[in-house]
């Protein structure tokens, strides 16, 4: 499809994808059938031709809603008719996940995407609006800089080319491509906090603070991400200099709390801030004390933190 044949919204989405996949041989697109990911998938066809890249689309069916199989099949058929390589992957979501159904679905979805992708990058359709919502949720939870930095453009194999694109643009892009995206009923369900942020909080913030509030929140996330990377690099340098091992963290007493917190976070990447602070609390407690963390237990002995991993 020539550049001039795309409508303005579709072109904005397609160019965002092109900028990210330039120089990539092959990539995978995760798609739910909703407007963001459907626009991403169609834009990827345009971008892959311009960049001479191969692209596959994976539609993940979480099997959590009645009719989800029909949505997945319909989305695949639409993309195949548009000349794309598309497949459906069905996943089982752990209903007992302690982090809740949304986190469990995310874990299952990403595992399915990586299974198809191998070592290829996986593109996801998060927009600037998603970024703004993520920052607000992190603020409400009292999160640190890593979470407040929001969604990174590249996070391992998962790439997010649409972080400078508004949700309204992906919706309009679907109109310009003359496709009807699936509307996830969960997106408007007030039982879900993210849905309430989207449908209740953001409209009020835009009314009070102006229509560019999402852009401002996203810009703050970008600034924090750059600073967070510097802090992480300093923490890793400190760990190298002090002989930190996978199960052993010495010499943390007397270190400034900001650096100490990040050293522990790098040492325990699955830990949340509540776990990190609990581990730091061991530094001022009696020897032999310990705290449970994801995957194991940390104990303090003779000024050194030890991690006993849970099998």
Curated annotation (Swiss-Prot):
Compartments in which it is found: Cytoplasm
Protein name in the entry: tRNA(Ile)-lysidine synthase
Lineage: Bacteria, Bacillati, Actinomycetota, Actinomycetes, Propionibacteriales
EC number(s) on file: 6.3.4.19
Main location: cytoplasm
UniProt: ATP binding residues: 32-37
CC annotations in GO: cytoplasm
Catalytic activity: cytidine(34) in tRNA(Ile2) + L-lysine + ATP = lysidine(34) in tRNA(Ile2) + AMP + diphosphate + H(+)
Species name: Cutibacterium acnes (strain DSM 16379 / KPA171202)
InterPro entries, per database record: Rossmann-like_a/b/a_fold (IPR014729), TilS/TtcA_N (IPR011063), tRNA_Ile_lys_synt (IPR012094), tRNA_Ile_lys_synt_N (IPR012795)
Pfam families for the chain: ATP_bind_3
Function description: Ligates lysine onto the cytidine present at position 34 of the AUA codon-specific tRNA(Ile) that contains the anticodon CAU, in an ATP-dependent manner. Cytidine is converted to lysidine, thus changing the amino acid specificity of the tRNA from methionine to isoleucine.
């Amino acid at each position: 499809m020539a550049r001039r044949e795309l409508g303005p919204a579709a072109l904005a989405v397609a160019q965002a994808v092109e900028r990210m996949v330039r120089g990539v041989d092959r990539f995978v697109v995760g798609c739910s059938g909703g407007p963001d990911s459907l626009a991403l998938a169609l834009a990827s066809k345009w971008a892959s031709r311009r960049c001479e890249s191969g692209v596959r689309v994976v539609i993940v069916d979480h099997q959590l809603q009645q009719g989800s199989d029909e949505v997945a099949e319909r989305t695949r058929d639409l993309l195949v008719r548009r000349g794309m390589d598309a497949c459906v992957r069905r996943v089982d979501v752990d209903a007992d996940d302690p982090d809740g159904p949304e986190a469990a679905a995310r874990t299952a979805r990403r595992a399915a995407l990586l299974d198809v992708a191998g070592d290829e990058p996986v593109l996801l359709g998060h927009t600037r609006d998603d970024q703004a919502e993520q920052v607000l949720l992190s603020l409400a939870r009292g999160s640190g800089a890593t979470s407040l930095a929001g969604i990174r453009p590249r996070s391992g194999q998962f790439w997010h080319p649409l972080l400078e694109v508004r949700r309204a643009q992906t919706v309009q892009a679907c109109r310009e491509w003359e496709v009807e995206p699936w509307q996830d009923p969960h997106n408007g369900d007030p039982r879900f906090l993210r849905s309430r942020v989207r449908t209740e909080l953001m409209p009020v913030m835009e009314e009070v603070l102006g229509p560019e509030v999402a852009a401002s929140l996203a810009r703050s996330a970008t600034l924090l991400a750059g600073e967070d990377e510097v802090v992480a690099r300093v923490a890793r340098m400190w760990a190298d200099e002090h002989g930190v091992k996978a199960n052993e963290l010495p010499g943390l007493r007397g270190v400034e709390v900001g650096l100490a917190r990040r050293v522990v976070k790098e040492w325990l990447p699955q830990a949340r801030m509540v776990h990190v602070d609990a581990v730091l609390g061991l530094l001022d407690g009696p020897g032999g004390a310990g705290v449970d963390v994801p995957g194991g237990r940390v104990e303090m002995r003779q000024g050194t933190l030890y991690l006993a991993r849970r099998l």
